[in-house]
Amino acid sequence: MTEYKLVVVGAGGVGKSALTIQLIQNHFVDEYDPTIEDSYRKQVVIDGETCLLDILDTAGQEEYSAMRDQYMRTGEGFLCVFAINNTKSFEDIHQY
């Protein structure tokens, strides 16, 4: 089975974990709980082929920025998340 590594990046508090948990568990988390790093796996069908998504939910806080290089080397796909009510989170997305 083909495996894809998806890395979810963006500023702290923009909803990376909420989006990830919605995808994995079909449940929306509405309480903010800062993430350092969480990893999830889900079997999905992409272009008619059953695949395994290995999803890495990353920390957005600046103090964890040193870990980003490792994420960028191992990731095969990236989901850049920003908050529509936080212009700075959109302007800063290029950092990821």
From Swiss-Prot:
Its EC number is 3.6.5.2. Pfam families: Ras (PF00071). Alternates between an inactive form bound to GDP and an active form bound to GTP. Activated by a guanine nucleotide-exchange factor (GEF) and inactivated by a GTPase-activating protein (GAP). One of its GO terms (cellular component) is Golgi apparatus. It is found in: Cell membrane; Golgi apparatus; Golgi apparatus membrane. It is a lipid-anchor. Transmembrane segments: none annotated. Keywords: Acetylation, Cell membrane, Golgi apparatus, GTP-binding, Hydrolase, Lipoprotein, Membrane, Nucleotide-binding, Palmitate, Proto-oncogene, Ubl conjugation. In its GTP-bound form interacts with PLCE1. Interacts with TBC1D10C. Interacts with RGL3. Interacts with HSPD1. Found in a complex with at least BRAF, HRAS, MAP2K1, MAPK3 and RGS14. Interacts (active GTP-bound form) with RGS14 (via RBD 1 domain). Forms a signaling complex with RASGRP1 and DGKZ. Interacts with RASSF5. Interacts with PDE6D. Interacts with IKZF3. Interacts with RACK1. Interacts with PIK3CG; the interaction is required for membrane recruitment and beta-gamma G protein dimer-dependent activation of the PI3K gamma complex PIK3CG:PIK3R6. Interacts with RAPGEF2. Belongs to the small GTPase superfamily. Ras family. This is GTPase HRas. It comes from Mesocricetus auratus (Golden hamster). The gene is HRAS.
